[in-house]
C-alpha cells in the first residue's frame, strides 16, 4: 500500500490541490474547483462588465476547469429580440448584505451577488472561506407547471466536457442576495416565505448514458431559516457522474410555478476520480 500527496500548479494559472492515494492498482486523484486564479479572470462577472447573468452568460461565454474539464451547460432564450439566460452558471465575485438594494424594481439585474453578512457591496471575500470567486446557478424544472416555456427542463447543469465519469464528492452552497431579499422580505412579484413553506435544492447525477445515478436534496430556505452563509453539501452518494443537474423548487407558487428567485451559489466543488482507470 502506497500513499502520496502532491500539489500541482496548472500552467493555465489555476492553483489546484491534488491528492493521490495509491492502493494496489488504484490511483485516486482529488481536485477542488475553486474558481480562483488567472485562468478564471476573464469569466468573472466584474471583468465581463455586468452584475446581470443574462449580460454575462452570452453565446461566447464558456468556462471549463482545466484539471477536471468541469463546465456549465448554459441555455439562453430569446424574447423580444433580447437574449435571456434560462439555465446556467456564471462565475462571480459580487457580494452584499444590503437586502433593501435587492428589493427594488430592477433588482434582478444584480442577480450575481452572493449574500455575505460582512460586506455591504464588495467584489472580494464573498466566496467560501473568504475566497473571492464562486458560481451562481439559475433555472429550474417544474414538470407539472405549464407556462410561456411549457414544461422545458431548465435545470442548471454541470458536466465533464471530456465525457469521462468522475465523483463530485461535495461542494459548498450559499444563497444569492436577491434570493435572500425576496424570500425574507417579499416584493410585488413574490411574497416572503410563510410558516410551513420551504425551498429545496436537489442535485441529480447522470452517467454517460444519461441514466440517473441518484439524487440528493438540501433545504435552502424556510421562514426564519434562510441560508446566509456557505454550507457544506455532501454529493458523494451520486457516485461517478458525467453530469449533475440542480433543481431549486418550492416556496410560494402561481400558475407559472415557483415565484421566488431561482438562484443559488456554489463554491469549492471537490471532484475525485481514478486516474489509472481513465488512462485505459
Protein language model annotation of sequence segments:
Residues 38, 173-176:
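Short glycine-rich beta-strand segments
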Residues 151-162, 257-260:
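Short aromatic-glycine motifs in intrinsically disordered, low-complexity regions
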Residues 195-280:
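Terminal, low-complexity interaction segments
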Residues 172-174, 190-191:
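Short edge beta-strand/loop segments characteristic of extracellular beta-sandwich folds
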Residues 3-8, 13-42, 273-280:
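Bacterial Sec-dependent N-terminal signal peptides
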Residues 182-201:
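Short coil-to-beta strand junction motifs in C2/discoidin
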Residues 163-170, 241:
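Extended extracellular/luminal ectodomain segments enriched in beta-structured repeat modules
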Residues 28-153, 163:
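N-terminal targeting leaders for non-cytosolic proteins
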